[in-house]
Amino acid sequence: MSDVTVAETPAVKTPTKAPKAPKSKTTKEPKAKVAAAHPPFINMVTAAISSLKERKGSSKIAILKYITANYKVGDQLTKINSRLRAALNKGVASKALVQSVGNGASGRFRVAEKAAATKKPVAKKPVAKKAATGEKKAKKTTVAKKTGDKVKKAKSPKKIAKPAAKKVAKSPAKKAAPKKAPAKKAAAPKA
């Protein structure tokens, strides 16, 4: 065994990976969101339902036909259909739409108008109260000339409030004028 000489194999150099040049980090600019060629689906649905004016409400198929005919939503009907279903379900959940017949996205849908009609009178009442309370504070100042007309209507039953509302800024001048007028009339017959 000692006679056998082992031929030395040249050491194979493992190819050392050249240090990669660090890639210059190019900050990819976020793609600007391209504005859609159509409004949100819930707006398109409400527009479709209101323009179709069907007595029992509009079906999903009729709404889909209206949207594809009037808006640029693309050619992929499966995507449009799924977004339409989602918009209908969301509209029913948020009470913007009323489902008159059916379950889920099937059936007939109408725009909920009763909720909008009941909200408007409620909003008007607090505004009138605020104007009335603001007028009480503003009697001493000359700022509330424009709101005087509105307050006159609200406080017409009270006799004390009427003169105060009419004579917001000119009350001293008007009071002085009636006092002088009787004096002149009294003086005129004597002379």
From Swiss-Prot:
List all Low complexity biased stretches.
Answer: 7-19
Subcellular location(s): the record lists: Nucleus; Chromosome
Domain annotation H15: ranges: 37-113
- The name under which this protein is listed is Histone H1.2
Its job: Histones H1 are necessary for the condensation of nucleosome chains into higher-order structures.
- What is the phylogenetic placement of the source species in the record? Eukaryota, Metazoa, Ecdysozoa, Nematoda, Chromadorea
Keyword annotations: Acetylation, Chromosome, DNA-binding, Nucleus
- Mainly localized where? nucleus
Q: Where is this region: Disordered?
A: 1-35, 116-191
Q: Where is the composition biased (Basic residues)?
A: 152-183
Give the molecular function GO annotations: double-stranded DNA binding; nucleosomal DNA binding; structural constituent of chromatin
Keyword Acetylation annotated: yes
